[in-house]
Amino acid sequence: MKKSILLFFITFLVISCSSDRDYLPEDFWGMKLKRKLTGNEAKDFVDKLHFQNVATEKNEVGFYTGEIGNATIYITYYTDEKTAYQDFRKMTEKISPENSMFVRGTYHNINNKQLYSCMGLGQVHYVFAHQNLLFWISVDPHFSRNFLDEYMKLVMN
């Protein structure tokens, strides 16, 4: 009996530690993942958006499309939670001034998570850190909040 419990516990730990969550699923909220960038391709894409080197070594970008509209999810991986949160603060402070292409920037507390939202380029943008990850979600305005709520459930659970 003790061996069975120990074997179950070890198996559970191995599965839990080895499973990587897919933050860019093939289908999400009625939309299809049309393109996924990883590795150097994702890093180069993020750097080109900023006209300078800003991306960490590990990034992912997912482009979603469906009948309802479009969304893009940018994910940056950090070595620890503290660095992810520091970059969240740094990034949101940099885009907060009304002289940037982003307007109406506001901090919120949604689902017990500090989040920043703003408007720009015809979309609503949400930025938040979770564990060692930094997320930037750009989504069409007419379904942005519902999309965010569902995506946060995916990330937090």
Regions inferred by a protein language model and the residue ranges of each:
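Positively charged n-region of N-terminal signal peptides that target proteins for export
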Residues: 1-4
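Sec-dependent N-terminal signal peptides
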Residues: 6-8
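C-terminal motif of bacterial Sec signal peptides marking the signal peptidase cleavage site
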Residues: 15-16
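Short, low-complexity, disordered segments immediately C-terminal to signal peptides
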Residues: 21-31
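Short Gly/Thr-rich strand-loop-strand
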Residues: 29-52, 81-125, 157
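A short acidic-to-branched-hydrophobic micro-motif
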Residues: 58-90
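Short, exposed beta-strand-loop hairpins at the edges of beta-sheets
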Residues: 126-130, 134-144
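Surface-exposed amphipathic alpha-helical segments
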Residues: 138-157
